[in-house]
Amino acid sequence: MSRAEALASVLEGTESLAIVCHDNPDPDCLASALALKTIAADAGVDNVTIAYGGEISHQQNRAFVNMLDIGLESITAVTTDEYDCLAFVDHTVPGANSVLSATVTPDIVVDHHPGNARNATFADVRTEYGATATIFVEYLRDLEIELTSRLASALLFALHRERLDFVREPTRREYEAALSVYSDADLEVLEQLYGSAFSPGTIDAIGRAIASRTRRGSSLVASAGDTAETDALPQAADYLLNLEGVDTVLVYGIVGDAIRMSARSIDPRIHIGETLVDGFDEFGAVGGHHDMAGGRIELGLFADDAGDRDQLLEFVGGRLTRRFFSALNLENER
């Protein structure tokens, strides 16, 4: 039995399915959720809900949801216990990158990030893949499910945004997956998605990151400040990675009640996910891939060390900067 058939067998006989995205979901997560919903419908599941935590603040992600008409529910409005089956897409560990309790056990897990899918009835975690959408393209092909233009467009955009648009080790599988969905995708929709406008908040956060950057050798750290735009952090990190002579970037900021971090590296000697774990694992949830990673640290850990949020940001920024450069063995670099 193939993995696609094993997934379908879990869904057969299921009446209701809750698909939970990670917090602040990106196109890879959203397209994967849409693909799983399609597979579930093909298996006869009548009631399917796609839920997410956090917010969708990246301008392309908002346009992605609206233009492709992806129905989403806030996880706070969904009681997962009321569903026969619970699925995680593009994340593995409950509580690590979602508001769900760490005690929750998903029935289905499909992901390309490192993680232990404990006790799941069906788990397919392929860290050698560059995108979760790639896995779902293979499922759809193996199950001979016909692609709609909407689903093909979602998967193609996800593959590009997750890997193919960047020098981030896209695997041969991402190119093959993109080729297989290309003919069914609406290229005009993709063109409009790429033209999505930045929000003023995102521009402000990226501007603060550019102005605040601190560099050691080919690595730098920057602050996006106190922002409501979670997705501004990875966008700022991507932008700063274009600076001449820079190959590793960490951008941090205060978002709501937490410090968020986004890191990028194109240095083959650096595993940026492991670097964040080395520097910040004792403070919060961090991790990621060889070339891209992120993390979240609760503000409560530092609340007693500073007064207002500006002072807190300055205090936290100093500590994060020192620990990041230390994890890269750049304490004495200039």
Report each predicted region and the residues it spans.
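Gly/His-enriched, cation/cofactor- and phosphate-binding structural elements
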Residues: 5, 12-17, 22, 30, ...
